[in-house]
Every structure is written in structure tokens, then in C-alpha cells.
Regions:
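Conserved NTP/Mg2+-binding pocket subregion across the NTase superfamily
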Residues: 61-166, 173
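Helical scaffold of the NTase/Pol beta-like nucleotidyltransferase catalytic core
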Residues: 1-25, 54-56, 248, 252
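Catalytic metal-binding acidic patch
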Residues: 24-65, 72-80
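Aromatic-acidic/polar surface patches that form glycan- and anion
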Residues: 2, 165-172, 229, 233
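Extended, basic/helix-rich recognition subdomains
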Residues: 155-212
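Structured mid-to-C-terminal alpha-helical surface segments
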Residues: 187-252
Length: 252
């Protein structure tokens, strides 16, 4: 557990959210085989009551000081327990902080509560990781996500994911591999472990692209795609999508 990275968030969260906090949980790469060079610190906060606009503003201002730059990026999500327990789909995300939204934050655009299918796999990972930073085990606060809702959620995000293929190539390819892996096996794996699984099953012509994405993720290669390799990115992504759609079409 990356204690220094995650623990430094606790005073900030307690100061801003106070007694509304029910639990704070580590998840993501830190609990799926360990942090990689490009990994975020992923934290979920479960609260009693919805955050106020003032609290969301304060969270953004404080998180921008400690996330990114010389420190690891932070992805922090707040959910109201009553919005996710009892479980219903799609769940509501009360607050989201991620470095990809920094430009919005700097323009004064605050995150607002909204439905978020992505919470289905996230809450599943939180429950599996069972890594509280504060509060009881997550199973005492969260209901399990039904498998059908998990499958629906991870497929729902594919079209939006594809719009980022040229700008966030590594992450998109690894995420597609993880979606395929999860649909096929029912297990949520780290991105590099999902890539390992997919590489053993992909046609040979698509393996170099995914292998390169995996190597960048692990810090074994620079974030650079040569012209020849980049021309093969779209065909590889299309193949992964066809494999995902094939499983989806067979699911009742």
C-alpha cells in the first residue's frame, strides 16, 4: 500500500468533509499488483450526506495542490452511501477529481453530482481490494454490484473511450484489453495483467501494438509511438472492440 501517497490525503478529506465521512478506501493499481510509473492514486470516499458546492470547491482547490507535478496524480471519487446502497444502476457520483479535468477546474468549472456507470467496476474493485484508509471494511458500507450491471457498465464507456485513442493511446488500448478480459473471465485485473491475458489470445498482427502499450505502462519504454506502430493502433483497437462486442452479443 502506498501509505505516504494515500495517507497524505486524509487530513485534507477530514478537514473538508468532516463527520460526513463513513469510510475512505484505496483501490486501483495500488491494490492490483502495485503502482506503476503512470499509475494514479485511486481513492473512494463514502459519505453520509451529499457534498455542498462549497465543499466541492474546497476539495478541488486542495487536491490541485497535492495531485500531479512532482507527486503522483490523484483520482478521488466521493459517493453518498444512500446513492449506492441499496444498489441501483446507474449509480450517482457525488464528486470526481482527476488530473484530466484540471483545465476545467482552473477555469472554475466545478465537478457536479451525476450518474456514473463507471462506478460499477470501481465499487467492485473497492470491495475486492478491501483496503480501508479510514473506517470499516467496504462491505459494511457498500452492496456488491450485480454481474449484469458490471458488464453493462464497462461496455457503456467504449464509444467515449475510442474518442481518446489518438490522444491517450496507451491507456485506451490497455482499457480495451481489460474490458475484454473482464467480460471473458469475470475478473478485474491490473492493466498489465489484462494485457498479458489479451496478448496470449490476440492475433499475431495486433500483439506488437498492445505489447508496446503494456511496456510504456510498466515504464519499460518511453511514451512514444513510431509511425509504423501508430498506423497499427486503430486496427488493434478495432479488433479488441469486435471481441468485446462478440461477447456482449452472446450475453442474455
Amino acid at each position: 500500500m502506498p501509505a505516504p501517497d494515500a495517507q497524505r490525503l486524509l487530513p485534507l478529506l477530514h478537514h473538508t468533509l468532516g463527520d460526513s465521512i463513513l469510510g475512505i478506501y484505496l483501490h486501483g493499481s495500488a491494490t492490483l499488483g502495485g503502482l506503476r510509473p503512470h499509475s494514479d492514486i485511486d481513492v473512494l470516499v463514502v459519505v453520509r450526506e451529499p457534498t455542498t458546492r462549497a465543499q466541492r470547491h474546497a476539495l478541488v482547490q486542495e487536491l490541485m495542490k497535492v495531485s500531479g507535478g512532482a507527486s503522483r496524480p490523484v483520482e478521488l471519487i466521493v459517493v453518498v452511501q444512500g446513492d449506492v446502497r441499496p444498489w441501483r444502476y446507474p449509480p450517482t457520483c457525488d464528486f470526481l477529481y482527476g488530473e484530466w479535468l484540471r483545465a476545467d477546474y482552473e477555469r472554475g468549472v466545478p465537478p457536479a453530482p451525476e450518474p456514473s456507470p463507471d462506478l460499477a467496476p470501481l465499487l467492485t474493485m473497492v470491495l475486492l481490494a478491501n483496503a480501508p484508509l479510514h473506517g470499516p471494511p467496504p462491505a459494511e458500507l457498500l452492496d456488491p454490484v450485480p454481474p449484469a450491471d458490471l458488464r453493462r457498465a464497462i461496455v457503456t464507456g467504449v464509444p467515449e473511450l475510442l474518442t481518446e485513442l489518438d490522444s491517450d493511446t496507451r491507456n485506451v488500448l490497455l482499457t480495451l484489453a481489460r474490458i475484454w478480459t473482464t467480460l471473458e473471465t469475470g475478473a478485474i485485473r491490473s492493466k498489465d495483467a489484462a494485457a498479458d491475458w489479451a496478448l496470449a489470445r490476440l492475433p499475431a498482427e495486433h500483439r506488437p501494438v498492445l505489447a508496446h502499450a503494456r511496456a510504456i505502462y510498466l515504464g519499460e519504454r518511453d511514451e512514444h509511438w513510431g509511425e509504423d506502430l501508430f498506423t497499427r493502433v486503430r486496427p488493434c483497437a478495432d479488433r479488441l472492440i469486435r471481441l468485446i462486442r462478440a461477447i456482449e452479443s452472446q450475453t442474455p
